[in-house]
A protein has these predicted regions:
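Metal/cofactor-centered catalytic core regions of large enzymes
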Residues: 42-45, 112, 138-571
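Terminal low-complexity/charged segments
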Residues: 1-210, 367, 371-373, 387, ...
């Protein structure tokens, strides 16, 4: 891609890096003026990532592997760093991994945020992060063959059926609370579960000593599906289905990645329409989570009222695109449908109604003593832990970090729409609730401005050519935090590689630190403050570290106890 060097960001950071590590950078390739990929010597990979992360205000929302043996004879690992200091840009650190040894030095001991990504690279590609502290599988099940790695370009024999796993558990749940408690798991399936997943709380009486969890029991294989079965624009509609609430955010991130790779100029009106729908999605998600927060503290009147107002955000989506879910609008290069004057006026009317409704509900919420009593000082995310693990969204902003991609790396029309960045310093559940409250009002103001100031341009750029093996990042500040996608185009009208990273993926690793020192009855509220997919936590094992006993209970029972605080499930 031709990039005007005079407007390139990150040059000062790269110059400092080259001075600090002479000869470390082997290659440098610009994707956009704000994005650059550097290939570094593999033995210096941890040093380079650590230097950018801590010395230049970098954050690590995503890392991934790629099988590039047909391109250069190697595997590759990519660490995408969002640089959020004085010079804001994206620096992607790439290292080539020998195809025979498959070893690369783990970054996790230097930057803990890399832990889940490196575990996934090992599972999906068979690469070996030497020095990785957590050697457990992340994605693959225990009975998956050791020599089969799904995202390699090798031919897969889909007829293979592995031998059944034994009744004995092979996955070690970790308790860092200095206890030799024995764990007796049952499951992970349970009749009350919406979806498989296993969540463990290690407790001493009612107090949580530690927590561990295993997810990925139902892995949809969307990245492999995109690479093998779908054309470029078909993946746009697949990305819509990544999440049931913020699917539009994923489709914007995906299309943005391809547009950045090809240098496509998206019409301004399409940018504005994308921003409008992204804020409608934020309203939907935040109002849902605020309602659930009411439910978890036993304030079900607030729960029902917030869900009543949330319905208006779905009516808004139906007005704008014909569906209560924001599906099917994006294409590479723009959008498929316009917002007409009548729809715009009706939406503005709904915005005014929602502002009045939400103001009344928030006043009622903050006047409810139980809300502050149950949320202040609970589930604290320590600033040091937050800095080390790169969580995202309201979770990180509730711990005092001013991080939001709409401000740090404006995309769509966010460079033109007035907006406010809200942070709270408490680090607790209450702070995260308040971030969502403030952002709800700001989304309404942004919608009003965007609907009143829609540019008169086309909706779609057409006539561009796809370039094999061009690649770039695309990103969105979804309601839960950063959705970051990376796409490399192929030479057969399909993607060579698609990395799709959702916000909750970045937030899971810090949850165990937020649960420690709190009580069992606070667990649903703390977990809910992340705004994760609840089906991931529908099964809980409680392990009493004093009595060395474990008890498996439905998540709904923990939720019930968190609301009424009677009849402890531990007894």
């Amino acid at each position: 891609m031709n990039v005007n060097s005079s407007s390139n960001r990150g040059e000062a950071i790269l110059a400092a890096l080259k001075t600090q590590f002479p000869g470390a950078v082997l290659d440098e390739e610009r994707q956009t003026p704000e994005q650059v990929t550097i290939t570094v010597k593999i033995n210096l990979l941890p040093d380079v990532v650590q230097y950018l992360y801590y010395q230049h205000d970098g954050w690590l929302p995503v890392l991934f592997g790629n099988d590039e043996r047909t391109l250069n004879g190697h595997y590759a690992v990519y660490y995408a760093l969002s640089m959020e200091g004085a010079e804001k840009c994206w620096i992607v650190v790439k290292a080539l991994v020998d195809a025979d040894s498959r070893e690369f030095p783990s970054v996790t001991p230097r930057v803990p945020a890399a832990v889940w990504g490196e575990r996934e690279i090992r599972d999906m590609y068979g690469l070996i992060p030497v020095g990785l502290p957590d050697q457990r599988r992340l994605v693959l099940p225990d009975d998956w063959p050791e020599d089969m790695h799904p995202l390699r370009k090798d031919a897969m024999d889909y007829r293979l059926r592995p031998e059944p796993t034994t009744d004995s558990e092979t996955y070690p749940f970790i308790n860092e609370g200095n206890s030799d408690a024995r764990v007796i798991p049952v499951g992970p399936l349970h009749i009350t579960s919406d979806e498989s997943g296993h969540f463990r709380l290690f407790v001493d009486g009612e107090q949580i000593v530690d927590a561990d969890y295993r997810l990925f029991y139902v892995h949809r294989g969307m990245e492999k599906l995109a690479e093998t079965r779908m054309g470029y624009n078909e993946v746009t509609f697949l990305s819509d289905r990544v999440c049931g609430i913020c699917g539009f955010a994923h489709s914007v991130a995906y299309t943005n990645s391809v547009e950045n790779a090809l240098g496509i100029e998206v019409p301004q009106r399409a940018h504005t329409i994308r921003s409008i729908l992204l804020e409608v999605e934020r309203l939907h998600s935040h109002l849902l989570n605020l309602g659930l927060s009411c439910h978890f503290v036993g304030f079900d009147t607030g729960f029902m009222q917030f869900f009543r107002v949330r319905e208006k955000s779905m009516t808004m989506a139906e007005l704008l695109i014909g569906s209560r879910k924001t599906y099917g609008l994006n294409l590479i290069g723009g959008v498929r449908r316009d917002i007409l004057k009548e729809q715009r006026l009706q939406t503005l009317k709904l915005v005014r109604e929602m502002r009045a409704d939400v103001s009344e509900l928030v006043e009622m919420l903050l006047a409810t003593p139980n809300m502050e009593q149950r949320t202040q000082g609970i589930g604290i995310l320590d600033r040091q832990i937050a800095r080390e693990y790169s969580p995202v969204g309201p979770l990180i902003r509730g711990s005092g970090f001013a991080r939001d991609l709409r401000f740090d790396h404006p995309y769509a029309d966010y460079g033109n729409i007035p907006k406010t960045l809200f942070t709270f310093t408490g680090g607790d559940v209450f702070s995260r609730v308040m971030v969502r409250v403030k952002e709800t009002f700001d989304s309404l103001a942004m919608l009003e401005f965007a609907l009143d100031n829609m540019p008169d341009t086309p909706l779609l750029t057409e006539g561009f050519s796809y370039k094999p093996h061009a690649f770039a990042l695309g990103f969105v500040e979804a309601p839960r935090g950063e959705d970051v996608h990376w796409s490399m185009l192929g030479d057969n009208q399909k993607l060579f590689r698609w990395r799709c990273s959702a916000a909750t993926y970045a937030n899971w690793p810090v949850l165990r630190y937020m649960l420690r020192g709190n009580t069992v009855s606070d667990a649903p509220l703390i977990i809910g403050s992340l705004d994760p997919c609840y089906s991931c936590t529908d099964r809980v094992t409680l392990v009493d570290v004093r009595k060395r006993q474990s008890k498996t209970v439905p998540y709904k029972e923990i939720e019930r106890y968190g609301i009424d605080r009677n009849r402890s499930p531990l007894k």
